[in-house]
Amino acid sequence: MHCPFCRHPDSRVVDSRETDEGQAIRRRRSCPECGRRFTTVETAVLAVVKRSGVTEPFSREKVIRGVRRSCQGRQVDDDALNLLAQQVEDAVRATGSAEVPSHEVGLAILGPLRELDEVAYLRFASVYRSFSSAEDFEREIQALRAHREVPAQS
C-alpha cells in the first residue's frame, strides 16, 4: 500500500482489528520511508447483478432510496431506514457470494420492511412483485395478516 504522505510504494501493518461487526478490517500502517502512520479500512466488495446482466456495487444508499419511496407519507425516520439497509446488506453478505442477483436484494428488503411498516411493505411488494390487480393486493394483505398471527400463536 502506498503511503498517502510520501507516496512510498510500501508500508508495514502495525495493527489489524475487525470493525463494523466483522464486515471490515481496520489496519494501522507505518511507512518505512517517512515514518508516518495511517489507517486503512478493508471491506469485501459485494456486487449486484441486475436483470440486464450488468454488475454494480451494492449500495445501501440505493436500498434506502427505493424503500424511502415506499415510505412516503409514513412515519418512518432516517434511522429506521439506515437500520433496514444494514439488515439488507447483512442478509445479502450472509449468502457468502461476492455477486448477488438484484432479485435476492429485493427479497432481503421485504422481510425487514414488513416489520417496519406494513403499508410501505405493500407499496414496495406491489412494484417488486408486479401486482396487476386488486386481487394481488388482497392476497398479499391476507399473507400479512397470517404472518402477524403466527408469532402470536407461539
Swiss-Prot record:
Its cofactor is Zn(2+). Keywords: ATP-binding, DNA-binding, Metal-binding, Nucleotide-binding, Repressor, Transcription, Transcription regulation, Zinc, Zinc-finger. One of its GO terms (molecular function) is DNA binding. Transmembrane segments: none annotated. Residues 46-136 form the ATP-cone domain. It holds the Pfam family ATP-cone. PROSITE patterns: ATP_CONE. One of its GO terms (biological process) is negative regulation of DNA-templated transcription. Binds 1 zinc ion. A zinc finger (unnamed) spans 3-34. HAMAP family: NrdR. Belongs to the NrdR family. NCBIfam families: transcriptional regulator NrdR. Negatively regulates transcription of bacterial ribonucleotide reductase nrd genes and operons by binding to NrdR-boxes. This is Transcriptional repressor NrdR. The gene is nrdR.
